Regions:
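Positively charged n-region of N-terminal signal peptides that target proteins for export
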Residues: 1-9
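N-terminal cationic leader/targeting segments used for protein routing and processing
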Residues: 3-4, 23, 27, 35
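C-terminal motif of bacterial Sec signal peptides marking the signal peptidase cleavage site
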Residues: 16-19
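A short, compositionally biased domain-edge/stem linker segment
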Residues: 33-45
Length: 354
């Protein structure tokens, strides 16, 4: 009997301990972590809206700045993963050159090629950038306009006109091309030379400053004017002398470097501000690659053309650049009426760049 009682007590003890263990294993009622909430997540970056950029240019296939814009279009679409689409209308197929400034201001075009002379009406101080020897060389020009001075100039244009230049591409440097085989060392050597210039006050003043007798002739009539002796010469970048075949009716070229031609990709300011920071970076980076392509092509062509013209029988002379620069710029600075709109502080900044 005692034995049975002990067995029963032992069994009850085992069952009791098992129940206690089960109770301890049961979780205590606690509010669930973040009860009633979904787990916190890092907010996703908002998706960028797709962008279309309508680019109107008057450059034609074969021009370095045409090739540059095809490169720009390719890079932008690739780097944006197709988020930015560039529609380039070349050869003036969308807007003619004299229509483009109004088109980009109104937003009918998003980007155009422009330059200081085309934007003078809205920013008169820009006239100084088309003065003879404002820039001495390609390096001088690109250091200025693609550096801190350019940032200041482009921001100011954006504030004044609602359009923003983004870079400065090299088009070529204008040289003197004469019908006669004549060596030109200083402006005095151009005395009495009827030099064709575009028909505007600014261009005609440049012709006088160079020491010549400026004669306005339309570009379309220039070949015949050189051939018949209506004018004694003309000035243009070397690639233009080749493409227009002026070398067929002239006998000498003098390297004067009197005007470093450049062109600016200009975007509508409202369009620019509508882009995200990432999209702006893509556009700026693509333009820099396009600029390098354009500049390299034009520099290479100019170097090759010297030998080409010599092979065609033209004499190529080197002018005294210091003599030309000092006299030509001096004539601008002496003409207070011409320079009254210039920003002289900005002018001095440009001249100080080496």
């Amino acid at each position: 009997m005692k034995k049975s009682l002990l067995v029963l007590l032992a069994l009850m003890l085992v069952l009791s301990l098992g129940a206690c263990a089960k109770e301890e294993a049961k979780p205590v009622d606690q509010p669930a972590e973040n009860a009633g909430e979904t787990p916190a997540e890092v907010p996703a970056e908002p998706a960028e809206d797709p962008v279309e950029l309508v680019f109107s240019i008057n450059a034609v296939p074969g021009d370095a700045h045409y090739e540059a814009m095809m490169k720009f279009e390719e890079i932008v679409e690739e780097k944006s993963g197709g988020n930015i689409k560039v529609d380039t209308y070349h050869s003036g197929s969308l807007f003619k050159q004299d229509q483009e400034t109004a088109a980009v201001k109104s937003g009918e075009a998003d980007i155009i090629y422009s330059s200081a002379p085309w934007l003078v009406e809205g920013s008169p101080w820009l006239s100084m950038f088309n003065a003879g020897y404002m820039f001495k060389t390609y390096d001088h020009m690109t250091k200025a306009l693609n550096g801190e001075v350019g940032e200041e100039v482009f921001e100011r244009v954006a504030q004044e006109q609602g359009i923003r230049p983004l870079s400065a591409f090299y088009l070529g440097t204008r040289q003197i091309n004469l019908v006669a085989d004549k060596e030109v060392k200083t402006p005095a050597d151009l005395n009495g030379v009827n030099l064709r210039m575009p028909n505007s006050d600014a261009w005609l003043f440049l012709g006088k400053a160079l020491g010549a007798n400026p004669t306005p002739i339309a570009f379309s009539e220039l070949y015949m004017a050189l051939q018949t002796g209506t004018v004694d010469g003309q000035d243009n970048p070397l690639p233009t002398v080749q493409s227009a075949k002026f070398y067929e009716v002239t006998k000498s070229i003098t390297i004067t470097n009197h005007l470093v031609d450049n062109v600016w990709p200009v975007i509508n300011e409202a369009k620019w501000q509508s882009l995200s920071d990432n999209q702006k970076t893509i556009v700026v980076d693509a333009l820099e690659e396009a600029r390098q392509l354009c500049d390299d092509l034009n520099l290479q062509r100019e170097a090759e053309l010297i030998e080409f013209f010599k092979g065609e029988g033209l004499s190529v002379y080197e002018a005294d650049l210091d003599a030309f620069s000092e006299e030509v710029l001096g004539k601008y600075l002496d003409n207070k009426e011409l320079t009254e709109t210039w920003d002289m502080d900005l002018f001095e900044k440009v001249q100080a760049i080496k």
